[in-house]
């Protein structure tokens, strides 16, 4: 959803200005049903962002993008199809499917020449979610190249309800590993969410994980694109500064810092209600 803005800031395009001009009359209207992405612009912006990144890549490492299925804007299926295929066309090494079951996402890419060459994986938070996904992908004779198993302590959107504290990453990983073994499927598993130390990582690797995913710990790294002020918020945050809420328009619970601007906006909206 932010790719047009990213393109404007990085490549001096004017996609956001163009869209704002078209829907200027609707800016103050809470009903956004008429607002649509220009899918041609979404494709162009994605190809610019991904293509320039791939051109700048050095070494043998791979570059992946995370693509959320859950969109609150109109025409979500068509938008998702454009985003996925534009990334493949621009040469991305791999795509991680997130924020949704993605039951139709492989089909949206099936006609792309790189569908079987690029690394395609999915984030799940339960064995049930993976089972549903695999039922769809096996019809295309294309298994995922990896599965990220995200636990209840992850930052950002969670694949759980507000009862997230009742779940445990290690248990979910074990359940999925057992299921894949039973089905004789060899798919690399990558635990994520709540892996805070090297010891945490080693424990999962010793149990057979192909890798681990760590994100929040790297928000304060030099390579992270966040402003220094935001990095400092992460660095100094304590447990009481972290909250799980339902302010996201996706409908998923979300873990965030209490200082995030999204919460200030949410509080302001509530205070303005009659």
Language model: regions and residue ranges:
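Active-site entrance/lid segments in N-terminal catalytic domains of soluble metabolic enzymes
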Residues: 1-183
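Residues that cap or flank secondary-structure elements
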Residues: 75, 192-193
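Conserved active-site-proximal phosphate/metal-binding subdomains
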Residues: 154-169, 173, 177-190, 196-274
């Amino acid at each position: 959803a932010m790719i047009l803005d990213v393109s404007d800031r990085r490549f001096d395009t004017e996609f956001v200005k163009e869209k704002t001009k078209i829907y200027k009359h609707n800016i103050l209207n809470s009903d956004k049903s008429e607002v649509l992405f220009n899918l041609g612009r979404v494709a162009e912006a994605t190809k610019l962002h991904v293509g320039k990144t791939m051109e700048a890549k050095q070494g043998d490492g791979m570059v992946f993008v995370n693509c959320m299925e859950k969109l609150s804007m109109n025409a979500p299926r068509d938008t998702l199809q454009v985003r996925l295929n534009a990334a493949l066309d621009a040469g991305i090494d791999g795509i991680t499917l997130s924020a949704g079951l993605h039951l139709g996402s492989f089909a949206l890419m099936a006609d792309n020449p790189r569908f079987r060459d690029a690394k395609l994986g999915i984030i799940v938070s339960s064995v049930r979610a993976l089972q549903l996904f695999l039922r769809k992908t096996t019809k295309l004779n294309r298994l995922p190249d990896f599965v990220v198993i995200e636990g209840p302590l992850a930052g950002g959107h969670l694949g759980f309800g507000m009862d997230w504290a009742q779940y445990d990453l290690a248990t979910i990983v074990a359940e999925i590993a057992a299921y894949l073994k039973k089905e004789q499927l060899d798919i690399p598993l990558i635990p994520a969410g709540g892996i805070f130390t090297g010891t945490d990582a080693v424990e999962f690797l010793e149990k057979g994980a192909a890798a681990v995913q760590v994100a929040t710990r790297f928000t304060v790294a030099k390579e992270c694109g966040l402003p220094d002020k935001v990095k400092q918020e992460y660095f100094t945050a304590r447990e009481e500064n972290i909250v799980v809420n339902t302010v996201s328009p996706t409908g998923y619970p979300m873990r965030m810092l209490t200082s995030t601007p999204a919460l200030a906006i949410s509080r302001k909206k509530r205070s303005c209600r009659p």
